[in-house]
């Protein structure tokens, strides 16, 4: 399946908010249990990733308004998108990821290559 197989809303959401599979997995984990309060350590344990990486992912999702961050030590997090459009997009993304996982993964991995290529092209010497 190609990127075209992804719904436009899912593509826009991925382009705007998701830059790695790990961040996607963190978001979907929190979404699957919206009433649960999570810590970075609990996320790391559940997904079997490094705690520092989990901390960075949940903080980024919090800054993007997809996860609620509540004061405390360690800080607790829960799935609570600030915008209803984001909530709907995450629901659609979860369904798409469940049915077309390879297409979603391909879409996420194809984007950094394009950004790196355009950055590298900025340093190409051009003939005048």
Q: Where do the model's predicted regions map?
A:
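Short alpha-helical segments that sit at the start of domains
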Residues: 1-25
